[in-house]
Amino acid sequence: MGKSTLLNALTGEKVAIVTAKPQTTRNRILGVVEVAARKGKRQDARPAAQIVFVDTPGVHKPGSQLDRRMLQEVYEALETRDVVLVLVDASRRVKLGDREQGTGDREQGTEGQRDGEEEGEPSDRLRQDDRREKRAKGPSWASEDEFLFGLVRKLDCPVFLVLTKIDLVPKDQLLPMIDALMKQHEFAEVIPVSARKKDGLDRLLARIVEKLPEGERYFPKDQYTDQPTRFMVAELIRERILVDTGEEVPYAAAVVIERFEEPPAEVERPRKKGAPQKLPLTRIAAAIYCEREGQKAILIGKGGSKLKEIGTGARKQIESLLGTRVYLELHVIVEPGWRDSKRFVEELDWRRELERLAGEGKTD
């Protein structure tokens, strides 16, 4: 479990996409959690609070323009924080303990960050891009840890160490793990959690509330994220690409929503008794960008089979999000070197796009 999984568990909603691949998260994602007041003895009581969590991309040394933009997302999130959580996958740290003398799998960013590791062996045709991915993710655990803790040491706010997947780790191995990490930084709190079993989540929320300043509510009670629907739809499509393709293809893919037609408001007509209700239809067209013709061939698959698989999986998730039927049209475009194009990378940032539209006096 990484930060995206934790965010989804805390909000009770699918705010962020989650996969087993590193560097899944590319943008800052806000998740809003309402914490109810608790009465009782002084040590047990707490005020009502609204916690705004910011899920950031992974902290790693940048290798491309996309990497630099992702790291900028981290810096911008740190400018407005009251508390910072550094997540460590305890189960993976145990598995890697005999392989490398580092500080293990730590996250203040992407899900399951495993620098320089990918699933499977790349083919000769894709080996060059695979090497590029490994360079972008960093040369070693030690150097990445040094980079991460270098950022953390500059912060003037409470920093929590959150150990995840503790249900998969023997208890006698947790304390040595915590001791080793405490040597890297003096954390304000150390909180082991398991999202799968809901262990430690309430304690984590309580400790965060203790550190937060009093202030006005940022979001309405029923709002759990700040993401526009179009961005969430694009992310669900990208999630299927991450799940359904391998090697370097997911990292070279970007999704742009080209058309989003919501169903018109209809007057409810009487239905025959026992007839199922027909949900309205949302029409969506999206472009999947990649960098090479070989990647395009993989994304499309033989006879379009892979693109159909991606579309079918994404459509089900989008229908769950929107509460409507969805007609989803996908096509693939080759944009050589888009990850090193500042213009292209910035156009993928929905916050910048909203600022541009506001400056032109337009609305979404």
Task: Describe each model-derived feature in a short phrase.
Residues 1-81, 88:
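Conserved G1/Walker A P-loop phosphate-binding module
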Residues 138-142, 171, 194, 198, ...:
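Conserved phosphate/pyrophosphate-binding and hydrolysis machinery centered on Walker-type P-loop NTPases
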Residues 37-41, 46-47, 69-107, 112-190:
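Conserved C-terminal guanine-recognition region of P-loop GTPase G domains, centered on the G4
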Residues 229-364:
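P-loop NTP-binding site
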Residues 2, 167-169, 173, 177, ...:
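Conserved GTPase G-domain signal focused on the G5
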Residues 25, 59-61, 94, 169-170, ...:
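Catalytic P-loop NTPase motifs of RecA-like helicase/translocase cores
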Residues 55, 164, 194:
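Active-site glycine-centered loops adjacent to acidic/histidine catalytic or metal-binding residues
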Residues 188-189, 202, 212-220, 243, ...:
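Short, structured loop/turn "capping" segments at alpha-beta junctions
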